[in-house]
């Protein structure tokens, strides 16, 4: 009886205009027909995937979208110049861990929360909760959603599965076991090659994006509760020392000069038993035209330190310019919503772009084509464990990464790590005071 009365009352309210019919309707994708918006994009695999599909969005909405893409360094410079000059930019790609704090303080990031909550602008099945929480958090500032992930990354321990099987070596579960396995392989002659135990990035600032996983797993952090550098803490020093010792004792010669290209090349040449680096490098390791270890690689999450397994996550997101006109901001949101819907995220994943949506990874379409299930399982596990703060929580990220990188280099070279970390902490605090 109550249900019948409720229906009658609701019908009456609708007739009287007291309840908005749009509350029960799907999004009107033509509501901003005729709008023109401009996005600045990095020349990235996601851009390559979405560009050929633009006519689909424009036909559905009547919104004209101009995507301008540039190589990464040029893109970063152009984005900064145009936003600073208040150019006609409605949306853009951003790596939140690198730039969000700077761009937020500058007033260039429009919060998306109101758009997401508005049923007239966002389809119910778009579903923000389908994105891995670590990436949703990583693309937010002060509790405001300022980006939607289009490319999700973490790092994995990749290892020579064939050699581990042949020599009956267990995949390391802890940092202690990681060191033991690296020691076991280091200097061992296998198939006519003298192996190194592990290869890692060691070239200053470039190493920080991988070292940070060791930092968290050892219980350390970039800053303490007072917002000061935490580098002089016992946990941070332990992470610096372990990473440096591992590369110096069991890695290639000249470890302090290794960027990702040199490190991955060493692994692909079959010279290293293990490598810890970005999960996306699977595409390099498994390419038989470029890699001598294709088909011979296994994948695992970072071994547990005193604080557990705590890898970082990083991502590229799409954001809206806070200085764009309100109607163009809404049009930009419709584009971002469409570009990151479930179908497009699945399509991007099938095209080789790691998606931020769980539904894409769990889909039948992806699983039927997944020929590296250990990579998938450990990538998803790392997404779930992921720490979103992969860069220092400061505006001047490059400067602090340079300071951090010097401690890593000192650790690799066997210098006094505690003294180096203390000096870096003092310098970092001075830089953050500016």
Segments and roles (model prediction):
Residues 30-31, 36, 59, 64-65, ...:
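Conserved C-terminal helix/tail region of periplasmic/extracytoplasmic solute-binding proteins
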Residues 137-150, 155, 179-229, 272:
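Extracytoplasmic/periplasmic solute-binding protein
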Residues 181-184, 225-257, 302:
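Glycine-centered hinge/linker elements that transmit conformational signals in sensory
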Residues 25-31, 97-154, 210, 294-300, ...:
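Hinge/lid segment of periplasmic solute-binding proteins
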Residues 30-34, 113-131, 189-190, 196-202, ...:
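Short, solvent-exposed loop/beta-turn-alpha elements that line the ligand-binding surface or hinge
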């Amino acid at each position: 009886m109550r249900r019948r009365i409720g229906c009658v009352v609701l019908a009456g309210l609708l007739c009287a205009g007291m309840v908005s019919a749009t509350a029960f309707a799907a999004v009107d994708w033509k509501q901003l027909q005729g709008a023109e918006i401009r996005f600045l994009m990095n020349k990235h695999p996601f851009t390559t995937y979405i560009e050929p599909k633009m006519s689909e969005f424009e036909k559905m909405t009547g919104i004209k979208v101009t995507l301008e893409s540039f190589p990464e360094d040029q893109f970063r410079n152009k984005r900064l110049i145009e936003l600073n000059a208040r150019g006609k930019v409605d949306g853009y790609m951003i790596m939140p861990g690198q730039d969000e704090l700077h761009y937020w303080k500058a007033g260039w990031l429009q919060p998306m929360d109101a758009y997401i909550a508005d049923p007239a602008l966002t389809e119910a099945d778009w579903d923000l909760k389908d994105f891995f929480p670590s990436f949703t958090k990583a693309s937010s500032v002060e509790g405001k959603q300022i980006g939607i992930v289009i490319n999700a990354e973490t790092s994995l321990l990749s290892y020579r599965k064939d050699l581990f099987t042949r020599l009956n070596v267990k995949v390391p579960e802890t940092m202690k076991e990681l060191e033991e396995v690296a020691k076991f392989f280091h200097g061992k002659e296998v198939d006519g090659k003298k192996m190194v135990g592990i290869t890692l990035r060691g070239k200053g600032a470039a190493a920080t994006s991988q070292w940070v996983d060791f930092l968290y797993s050892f219980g350390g952090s970039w800053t303490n509760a007072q917002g000061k550098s935490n580098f002089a803490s016992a946990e941070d020093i332990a992470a610096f020392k372990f990473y440096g010792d591992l590369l110096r004792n069991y890695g290639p010669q000249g470890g302090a000069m290794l960027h990702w290209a040199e490190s991955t090349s060493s692994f692909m040449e079959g010279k290293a038993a293990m490598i810890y680096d970005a999960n996306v490098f699977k595409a390099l390791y498994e390419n038989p035209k470029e890699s001598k270890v294709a088909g011979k690689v296994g994948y695992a999450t970072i071994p547990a330190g005193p604080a557990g397994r705590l890898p970082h996550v990083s991502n590229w997101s799409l954001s809206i310019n806070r200085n764009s006109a309100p109607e163009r901001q809404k049009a930009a949101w419709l584009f971002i919503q469409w570009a990151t819907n479930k179908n497009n995220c699945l399509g991007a994943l099938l095209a080789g772009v790691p998606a931020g949506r769980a539904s894409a990874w769990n889909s039948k379409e992806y699983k039927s084509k997944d020929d590296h299930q250990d990579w998938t399982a450990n990538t998803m596990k790392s997404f779930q464990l992921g720490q979103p703060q992969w860069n220092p929580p400061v505006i001047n990220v490059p400067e602090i990464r340079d300071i951090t990188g010097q401690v890593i280099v000192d650790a690799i070279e066997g210098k006094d790590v505690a003294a180096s970390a203390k000096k870096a902490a003092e310098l970092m605090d001075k830089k953050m005071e500016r």
